[in-house]
Amino acid sequence: IWAAGAHHSSEDLQHFHHVNEQYEYRRDFIFRLLAEAGIPIEFDAVIARGGLLKPTPGGVYAINEQMKYDLLHARMEHACNLGALIADEMAKKCGCPAYIADPEVVDELQPAARYTGIPEIERISIFHALNSKAVSRKYAASIGKHYEELNLIVVHLGGGISVGAHCQGRVIDVNNALNGEGPFSPERAGTIPADQFAELCFSGKYTLRQVKKMLNGKGGLIAHLGTNDVASIAHKAEAGEEPYKGVLDAMLYTVAKQVGAMYVSLRGKVDAIILTGGIAHSDYCVGAL
């Protein structure tokens, strides 16, 4: 098995005005990695991370023209919308099928988890479904059980942070990790005081697009510290340097609170808590949690 990956910093991406503009940049990066490793574009199948499609159950889906259209014209911006497009182009080069698996919009919420205090607003399921379900299955196999037998709290720690309650193979509750719910993260604002946010929205200082960027893309650690590089921030926090330590510790505090909330969703019956995602490589962050 050959594996490779990379972190695209906020500085690398700042000149792109819309995520769709990153298509060639990300596609060329992947093709360059393969070329440098001497791996020819000759595959039996290509599978990619899913995108922000309509709510759907977990599973594997073939990429088709309607899916590609929906991703190109998605209401919500995220780099995951490009995965299927890149996979489709790669698959066409070698004449093989292309798929996505467990897209971010996997929706298995229990009915009570959908309600909010405003009838016109319903909670929606957007989280790191692919990774969360994959590590859950891997953990289950490691203890000789099936994913569908376990109750798990899975914490994905990346540019966005999702904390989900996995009840016997279904994610019955999880924060919307993209659009302003749950912990704040390297790039997301998370849950914020509603009244103060309403005042900010109608202050006349910001456009709708700017406000949405505060929630997703320019919120969280970037807003406080000017960077989403958690490894660098954690190094400074470990040395006691402010404001890095205070901000990072506060972010991790919001994560821990969300874990506690998911205990309630699972009625206190939890077999394991799983930490995954890039930030899970940080000893400082894992230790704090």
Stretch-by-stretch model annotation:
Residues 1, 161-165:
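Short beta-strand scaffold segments in enzyme catalytic cores
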Residues 1-21:
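Short glycine-rich, Thr/Ser-proximal phosphate-binding strand/loop in the N-terminal lobe
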Residues 30-44, 142-146, 259-271:
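Phosphate/pyrophosphate-binding loops at sites that engage ATP/ADP/AMP, CoA/4′-phosphopantetheine
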Residues 34-79, 97, 105-116:
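Short beta-strand-loop/turn "lid" adjacent to the catalytic site in phosphate-handling enzymes
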Residues 81-89, 100, 107-108, 115-151, ...:
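Glycine-rich phosphate-binding loop plus the immediately following alpha-helix
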Residues 213, 217-268:
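Adenine-nucleotide phosphate-binding core of ATP-dependent small-molecule kinases
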Residues 271-289:
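Glycine-rich phosphate-binding loops at beta-strand->alpha-helix junctions
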